């Protein structure tokens, strides 16, 4: 009989190879990436365009444009679009991030031919109707006003502004007046400039059932437009570490954001740094969780992670604590940073974190959608094809001395920006 009081032995992770995508360059220069998997009769279609915040000529125009894409086309109202998507049990949404805009369709495979014309119409013929535009602007401003009542939201805003600078798109704060001043003409012009299908990266995965050619015909027509101007904005060189405490009268909570510029994913030590970050604050048994949550009882949770954008990467440590406990929490974070610099990580702890990192990675590849997410990251971040194979190899091979060296180079408390809001 199985003895459930004894944990099963940990097995080493075998070599990981992502499924190879079929890549086709379409007549208009767009690229179609296909990852077939017929385990379930479902499909996901994603169209990625260079229409993120980094490309906008006016603040928050990328956000406004993406959120208006489903609000009406030349042939359909927003209600008609929503009804058609719901009728087929599908989902369709469009979002804008720091670097790109992403339109995503999930549907049953048999409905893909029916829904493709709708997706094409949404991408190429949005009309940005005035009534829906006004309502969206009002809703968005109200939502931001609600979010800004939270110290955690304001701390993140201020941290990004201090890290990247107020003039850099990654560091710009949401400006309510500027957002309300955006017009339908602004959205139409940005759509014309930043949403050409010739610049699209199209990702099709799931039970594609021979529909690749139909997708290629849908998104491959039209002229090969000029590349979207996305002026390279290197990481600000005037970053200044230090402390920035913003008092919030009447607030019982304080939100902490601590971090610094961080090596990009293309850096040769990126996977070792990922392991170091995991040990610091990347899982429930991390150093920060054990100290600040379990031992000191200052918070329900604390994290450390690297945030990758196409033109800059940052390390961020974040938590919410009682206002009176903020100085102690900052001091304990700095204490844990110095411990990693001054002490070798015990072999047992290092082995636990390696197993956690590799196990979580394997679990994150359990569906074709998740596999496609990893592949898409390689494409958009221009990473080597064996990036995730390197992750497994370097994670397994990294020793405590290497992590201590990296901590001494990158985790000095004096090199951090400390933001306390509350």
Please give the residue ranges for each predicted region.
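His/Glu-rich zincin catalytic helix
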Residues: 1-83, 188-291, 330, 334, ...
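Charge-rich, well-structured scaffold segments of protease-associated domains
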Residues: 1-6, 80-229, 294-422
């Amino acid at each position: 009989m199985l003895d459930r009081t004894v944990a099963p032995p940990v097995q080493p992770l075998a070599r990981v190879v992502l499924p190879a995508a079929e890549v086709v360059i379409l007549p208009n220069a767009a690229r179609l990436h296909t990852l077939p998997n017929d385990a379930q009769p479902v499909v996901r279609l994603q169209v990625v365009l260079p229409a993120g915040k980094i490309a906008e000529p006016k603040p928050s125009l990328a956000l406004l444009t993406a959120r208006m894409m489903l609000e009406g086309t030349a042939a359909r109202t927003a209600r008609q679009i929503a009804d058609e998507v719901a009728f087929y049990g599908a989902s369709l949404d469009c979002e804008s991030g720091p670097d790109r805009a992403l339109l995503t369709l999930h549907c049953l495979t048999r409905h893909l031919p029916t829904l493709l014309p709708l997706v094409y119409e949404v991408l190429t013929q949005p009309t940005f109707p005035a009534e829906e535009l006004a309502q969206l602007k009002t809703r968005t401003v109200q939502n931001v006003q609600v979010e800004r009542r939270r110290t955690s939201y304001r701390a993140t805003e201020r941290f990004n502004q201090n890290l990247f600078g107020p003039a850099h798109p990654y560091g710009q704060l949401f400006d309510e007046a500027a957002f309300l001043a955006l017009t339908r003409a602004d959205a139409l012009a940005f759509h014309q400039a930043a949403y050409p299908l010739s610049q699209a990266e199209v990702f099709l995965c799931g039970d594609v059932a021979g529909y690749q050619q139909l997708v290629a015909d849908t998104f491959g027509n039209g002229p090969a437009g000029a590349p979207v101007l996305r002026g390279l904005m290197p990481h600000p060189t005037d970053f200044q570490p230090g402390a920035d405490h913003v008092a919030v009268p009447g607030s019982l909570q304080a939100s902490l954001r601590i971090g610094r510029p961080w090596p990009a994913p293309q850096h040769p030590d990126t996977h070792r740094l990922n392991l170091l970050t995991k040990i610091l604050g990347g899982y429930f048994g991390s150093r920060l969780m054990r100290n600040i949550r379990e031992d000191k009882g200052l918070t329900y949770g604390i994290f450390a992670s690297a945030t990758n954008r196409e033109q800059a990467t940052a390390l961020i440590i974040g938590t919410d604590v009682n206002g009176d406990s903020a100085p102690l929490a900052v001091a304990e974070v700095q204490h844990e940073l110095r411990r990693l610099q001054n002490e070798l990580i015990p072999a047992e702890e290092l082995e636990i974190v390696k197993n956690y990192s590799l196990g979580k990675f394997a679990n994150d590849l359990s569906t074709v959608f998740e596999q496609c997410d990893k592949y898409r990251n390689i494409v958009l971040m221009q990473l080597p094809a064996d990036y995730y194979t390197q992750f497994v190899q370097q994670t397994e091979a990294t020793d405590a001395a290497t992590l201590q060296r990296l901590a001494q180079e990158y985790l000095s408390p004096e090199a951090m920006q400390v933001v306390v809001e509350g």
